[in-house]
């Protein structure tokens, strides 16, 4: 199978946790003998912010961990259209711009030979349905939804049996427990603040419990505003 995956970025995971899942899936497909190409904008905001924070060296860990992966960059639809024309399947992630999602749908309606799927890994269809309705999915063959609740929303929107649940998971070839027993101390949280969408949950289920039992807490992530950093300081995190 020849697969084209159109993503916001494969190179950067800055506030883009889907990149970890996508890298693992694409590498696994390559290992099984499929031809895989990823496509991303020339200057996605995730890459821009990663380089701003860490310089070009910030891109090195991805290249070292996934030497078999590469992504083609594009400036406009014409640069994307020709290479995709030979694909058997094209998957379009929902972090792409609405104009691009619509353009690929039009191409499929006009006879493009590939199967075209929309990949939704966010909760906006539930929490902010109008944001998802901005995407013109006319011409798409189906939807990949990251959970059953999200899939049910698409079924109500008329997608019926053309919705498939595709849970995200860790790439265990890279993320796994230590092979040998080591001394472990404290608690580590890896994640972003999330524009206050989960600040109450972090306070209730992470910060307070860790402080209550005196457990050292290390946090890794981006987009922690001043208020969030003050909350972490109060909990000695």
What are these regions (language model features)?
Residues 9, 23-24, 37-154:
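Extended catalytic core of nucleotide-activated donor transferases of GT-like folds
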Residues 53-57, 140, 160-163, 229-237:
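Active-site regions of enzymes building and remodeling cell-envelope glycoconjugates
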Residues 171-237:
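Conserved catalytic-core segment of nucleotide-activated headgroup transferases in glycan assembly
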Residues 149, 166-169:
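Carbohydrate-associated surface elements
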Residues 18-29, 204-206:
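Short amphipathic alpha-helix
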């Amino acid at each position: 199978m020849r697969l084209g995956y159109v993503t916001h970025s494969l190179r950067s995971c800055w506030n883009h946790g889907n990149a970890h899942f996508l890298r693992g899936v694409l590498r696994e497909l390559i290992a099984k003998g499929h031809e895989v190409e990823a496509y991303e904008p020339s200057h996605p905001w995730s890459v821009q912010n990663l380089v701003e924070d860490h310089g070009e060296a910030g891109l090195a860990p991805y290249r070292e961990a996934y030497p078999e992966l590469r992504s083609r960059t594009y400036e406009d639809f014409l640069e994307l259209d020709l290479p995709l024309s030979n694909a058997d399947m094209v998957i379009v992630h929902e972090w792409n711009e609405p104009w691009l999602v619509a353009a690929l749908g039009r191409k499929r309606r006009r006879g493009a030979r590939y199967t075209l799927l929309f990949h939704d890994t966010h909760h906006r269809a539930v929490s902010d349905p109008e944001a998802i309705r901005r995407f013109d999915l006319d011409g798409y063959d189906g939807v990949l939804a990251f959970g059953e609740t999200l899939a049910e929303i698409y079924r109500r929107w008329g997608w019926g049996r053309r919705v498939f649940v595709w849970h995200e998971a860790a790439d265990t070839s890279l993320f796994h427990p230590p092979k040998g027993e080591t001394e472990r101390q404290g608690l580590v949280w890896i994640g972003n603040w999330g524009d206050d969408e989960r600040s109450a949950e972090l306070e209730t289920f992470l910060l307070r419990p860790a402080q209550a039992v005196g457990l050292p807490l290390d946090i890794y992530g981006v987009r922690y505003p001043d208020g969030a950093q003050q909350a972490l300081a109060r909990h000695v995190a």
